[in-house]
Amino acid sequence: MEFIQRHIENVKEKKNFAVRLYRHWVDRTIPYTTYRWLTVSGLIALFFIRILLVRGWYIVCYTLAIYLLNLFLAFLTPKFDPSVEQAMKDEEIEEGVLPTSKDDEFRPFIRRLPEFKFWYSSMRATLFALVASFFRIFDVPVFWPILVVYYLVLSFFCFRRQIQHMLKYRYVPFDIGKKKFGSH
């Protein structure tokens, strides 16, 4: 019995060491944003080339594309929805509460899905899809042009809604052209 407990403890220690080592290497990639995204882009390109060459696993490809679209929309969406804030302001006006802030007050754009989590989830999903494309069980026969049309229609409606939301509440989720302070 003591031997089994020591063996279980040894396995747990090795697992914890492997998890810590994995987290260490993932955490070391944080400052290298460009290289991280180039790696994910390369993996996605490799996956799509594989799908085109083997002419199969279209469901896996469609699932990955939908998941990446969902992640991207969460990346573009603010953490605190301005429509909810606007409804609360309207309710305060009706109740007669004194204003506590100005409309022109600076409010930083905080994403619902931070960039690192977006990258990490994209990387894991792409690796999972790449591995799944090697197993015949995931090669479900489907007419792929329908999946492409579904994806394009879904993307169109999602992006249209997101752009309308951005225009209505006047926020820009990108920091291109904004001043950067610090050691950048």
Curated annotation (Swiss-Prot):
UniProt keyword Transmembrane present: yes
Entry's Gene Ontology cellular component terms: COPI-coated vesicle; COPII-coated ER to Golgi transport vesicle; endoplasmic reticulum; Golgi apparatus; Golgi membrane
Keywords annotated in UniProt: Membrane, Transmembrane, Transmembrane helix
Cysteine disulfide links: none
Membrane topology term: Multi-pass membrane protein
Entry keyword Transcription regulation: no
InterPro entries: Rer1
Protein name per the record: Protein rer1
Organism: Schizosaccharomyces pombe (strain 972 / ATCC 24843) (Fission yeast)
Gene assigned in the entry: rer1
